[in-house]
Structures are given as structure tokens and as C-alpha cells.
């Protein structure tokens, strides 16, 4: 069976790899000139299943109002003329109840934990090198109020069987020695020892090479225009004016996925959540992070690669604007300068932005559609790197009619309604 995968970010590439392993003939199409050149290019670098949480949470509406007036707020809303922005916000607000938060977080943690296990297996099988570290993630709380509020997340971790450790100031200095000088300004920390780090762009590039070795064909520099349908089937993809056909199709185009789905009558509530990062050369390894640090106040992650520090975070609802906001750079520099003032050379930092494809409930969309041969793997928000391997393998199993290793409940697009356009009465074809 021939599969056309649209998108060569970390999601599309992992999907292609697992499909090829399952015996499918796979072609990947992307407008970029290489894998992982957009959202996957310079993300925060963390593989953090335990911190898989939706932005839609109790208390967020009030916090968002307060953040409107803060210079270094983690969330910013830039009103546009796009009605989809306001619809997405309304849907997000409906998910800010305690019950919805717990349900959404369970789905996200389930997929993220599985994805971490898939990454471990992939690394053991292939020896893929992406500057990965398996040294955990530490979430820093600057106030006692933040530490107390973490109780609801800790409860979910406990129910999900995720190991964790609460750290006092001495414990923070033990796991992250470079923070010893600032530990007295922190209230405490939550450490997840099983979390990991790694360069997502490097991983995707090298996985694409492994996929090519399995027969996957990558076609770069080609723009996907629209999907063509006939009844309940997709009959082809219009690419640079020509029609490309396959037996099965996978849409993994991140924030751009809804544009292709809307003409098919599929409403995918995905909106771009703009994020920023700095990549900083390390000048003193002893004063740099050991693994990943999450600053709860600013919602910023600081991650250690071999010779670089990656500082990433922020969330802007600003449509598809890819301009670099200097105020966001100030925030990233503020956080890393406060916690690791001697670790890297900020004067040589590279500033970047990308559009994360966010759903209003935080859970990605992985699975079938009402079209018998169209599948989705998109909407991973800030957790594309964390969820990539698990999402790719899960979808490949579903398409091959192989029993998945985890439950796929609540992950496909049918959770957004029972209308005809979102029903999932599909019959995926098996691999030869």
C-alpha cells in the first residue's frame, strides 16, 4: 500500500518511519528544502511526558487577564481579523474546568509516556544521535503559592504512575549544581527523573535518513495545495498543480492542517501558538544546565545540548505572523540571565520563532477521519517533540490494523463532535 505523508516536521517524519517499518510504501512531501525546517527547527528541546499539560486549566482565564498588563507574560493575545482565533479561544475557555483539565491531561500524559518509551526503543535499536540526555526535568517554583498549586498536577502524576520528586533548595542545587547561587530565591522544585532532552531538528534530520534507508521517498520544495475527494475517499493531492495519488494519506502539516481539511467538511480546531527560542553557545559548562529547567513564573524552558543552551517558551496568539518580537527576546534573556548568568554567551545567541499547532483542549489529533483513507497526526501544540514517536507509531499501528500498545481513546477528531463531518466510520487498508 502506498501512503502519502504531507509534512516533514518531527511528526510527519516519525510517522513515515513507523509506516515504512510496518511495510508501507511511503512518500513524504513538504514545501521546505529539508526535514524539520519550521516548527521543529529550534523548539525548547525537552521530552517531558510528566509536564504534558493543557494550557486550558482552572484559573487560566483570570491569569490571562492579568498577563495582558505584564511585560514578560507567558501568554499574549494579539487580536487579528481571523474569526477562528476567537472561536479557538472560546473553545479553550470551555476546557478550563477542573474536570476537563484532568481528562485532557490524562490523554496527554498517556500519549507522552508512550512516546518516551518509543523514543527509548528507537534509540536502542538504531543508535540515533541527537545530543540526547536522559537526566530528567526540574520545574522551578519562585513562590510558595506556585509550589502549593502544583498539587493538582502531582495528583495526576501519581495516578498515572509517573515518578516524581519534590526538591527543597538543597535538592535543587544537588540536581542542577549551577543553580546553587540562586537557590535561596526559589521556593522549591518538582523533578521528573524520567524526562529527557535532545535537539529535535537533529533527531528529525537523522531519522529521515533512517527512513530513507527503509525506502521512504522525501520530496522537498513542493507545495501542497489541496486534497481531492470522491465520495468517502481521497483520490489525490494537488501538489504544485499536479495530482498525486496514493492508497492512503496522512496529514501532518501542523498549524496549516485546517486549511486543507475545511474544504472536505472537517473542522479541526487547530490554531497557531507562536513560540520563541534562543540558542546560546556555552562558555562555561559547569555554569550551564545539566538537563532541562522549567521556570514556572515565565513558562520558559532552559535545556542543555552538548555545546549549546536552548531557551524556549512564550505563547502568542497572533495568527500566522512569524516576525521576531524583540520583547520576547528580552524575556528569554531575563530568565536565562537570572538563573544561568555565566553559562552562555548571550551576545552570540540565535533568536527564532515558530508556530505550534495547538488544539483548545491540548490533546493532539491522531487517528482516522470520515474519509476511509485519510488520517491525521497534528495539533500537538508545545509537545510535538515529546509526543512525536508515540504519535507516529500509534498512527502506523492503526493504519496497519495492528493492535496499538496504548489506548487511542479520545485522541482522534471525533471528540470534537458527533456531526457527519467528524464521524470516524473508517476502514483503513492493511499493508501488503
UniProtKB/Swiss-Prot annotation:
Annotated binding of FAD, by residue: 3-17
Top-rank EC class of the record's enzyme: oxidoreductase
GO cellular component, one term: plasma membrane
InterPro entries recorded: DadA (IPR023080), FAD-dep_OxRdtase (IPR006076), FAD/NAD-bd_sf (IPR036188)
Chemical reaction(s) catalysed: a D-alpha-amino acid + A + H2O = a 2-oxocarboxylate + AH2 + NH4(+)
MF terms (GO), sorted A to Z: D-amino-acid dehydrogenase activity
Associated pathway: Amino-acid degradation; D-alanine degradation; NH(3) and pyruvate from D-alanine: step 1/1
Statement: the UniProt record of this protein carries the keyword Glycosyltransferase: no
Listed GO biological process terms: D-alanine catabolic process
UniProt entry keywords in alphabetical sequence: FAD, Flavoprotein, Oxidoreductase
Pfam hit, one: DAO
Highest taxon, organism lineage: Bacteria
EC number: 1.4.99.-
Cofactor(s) it depends on: FAD
Keyword Kinase recorded: no
Biological role stated in the UniProt entry: Oxidative deamination of D-amino acids.
Membership in a protein family: Belongs to the DadA oxidoreductase family.
Name of this protein: D-amino acid dehydrogenase
Source organism per UniProt: Azotobacter vinelandii (strain DJ / ATCC BAA-1303)
Amino acid at each position: 500500500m502506498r501512503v502519502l505523508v504531507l509534512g516533514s516536521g518531527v511528526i510527519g517524519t516519525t510517522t513515515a518511519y513507523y509506516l515504512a517499518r510496518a511495510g508501507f510504501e511511503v512518500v513524504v512531501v513538504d514545501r521546505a528544502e529539508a526535514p524539520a525546517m519550521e516548527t521543529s527547527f529550534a523548539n525548547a528541546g525537552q521530552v517531558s511526558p510528566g509536564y504534558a499539560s493543557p494550557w486550558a486549566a482552572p484559573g487560566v482565564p483570570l491569569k490571562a487577564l492579568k498577563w495582558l498588563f505584564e511585560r514578560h507574560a507567558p501568554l499574549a493575545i494579539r487580536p487579528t481579523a481571523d474569526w477562528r482565533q476567537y472561536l479557538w479561544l472560546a473553545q479553550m475557555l470551555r476546557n478550563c474546568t477542573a474536570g476537563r483539565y484532568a481528562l485532557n491531561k490524562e490523554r496527554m500524559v498517556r500519549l507522552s509516556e508512550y512516546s518516551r518509551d518509543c523514543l527509548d526503543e528507537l534509540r536502542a535499536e538504531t543508535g540515533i544521535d541527537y545530543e540526547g540526555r536522559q537526566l530528567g526535568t526540574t520545574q522551578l517554583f519562585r513562590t510558595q503559592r506556585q509550589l502549593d498549586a502544583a498539587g493538582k498536577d502531582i495528583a495526576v502524576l501519581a495516578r498515572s504512575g509517573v515518578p516524581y520528586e519534590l526538591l527543597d533548595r538543597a535538592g535543587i542545587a544537588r540536581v542542577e549544581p549551577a543553580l546553587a547561587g540562586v537557590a535561596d530565591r526559589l521556593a522549591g522544585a518538582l523533578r521528573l527523573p524520567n524526562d529527557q532532552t535532545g535537539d529535535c531538528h537533529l533527531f528529525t534530520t537523522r531519522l529521515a535518513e533512517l527512513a530513507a534507508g527503509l525506502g521512504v521517498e522525501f520530496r522537498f520544495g513542493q507545495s501542497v495545495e489541496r486534497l481531492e475527494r470522491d465520495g468517502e475517499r481521497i483520490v489525490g493531492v494537488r501538489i504544485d498543480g499536479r495530482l498525486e495519488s496514493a492508497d492512503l494519506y496522512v496529514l501532518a502539516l501542523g498549524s496549516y492542517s485546517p486549511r486543507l481539511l475545511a474544504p472536505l467538511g472537517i473542522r479541526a480546531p487547530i490554531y497557531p501558538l507562536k513560540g520563541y527560542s534562543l540558542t546560546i553557545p556555552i562558555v562555561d559548562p559547569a555554569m550551564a544546565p545539566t538537563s532541562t529547567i522549567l521556570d514556572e513564573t515565565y513558562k520558559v524552558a532552559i535545556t542543555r545540548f552538548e555545546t549549546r543552551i536552548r531557551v524556549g517558551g512564550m505563547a502568542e496568539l497572533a495568527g500566522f505572523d512569524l516576525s521576531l518580537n524583540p520583547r520576547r527576546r528580552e524575556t528569554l534573556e531575563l530568565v536565562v540571565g537570572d538563573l544561568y548568568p555565566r553559562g552562555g554567551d548571550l551576545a552570540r545567541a540565535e533568536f527564532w520563532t515558530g508556530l505550534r499547532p495547538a488544539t483548545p483542549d491540548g490533546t493532539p489529533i491522531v487517528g482516522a477521519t470520515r474519509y476511509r483513507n485519510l488520517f491525521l497526526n497534528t495539533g500537538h501544540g508545545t509537545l510535538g517533540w515529546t509526543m512525536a514517536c508515540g504519535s507516529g507509531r500509534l498512527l502506523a499501528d492503526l493504519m496497519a490494523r495492528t493492535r496499538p500498545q496504548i489506548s487511542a481513546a479520545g485522541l482522534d477528531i471525533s471528540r470534537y463532535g458527533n456531526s457527519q463531518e467528524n464521524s470516524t466510520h473508517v476502514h483503513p487498508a492493511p499493508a501488503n
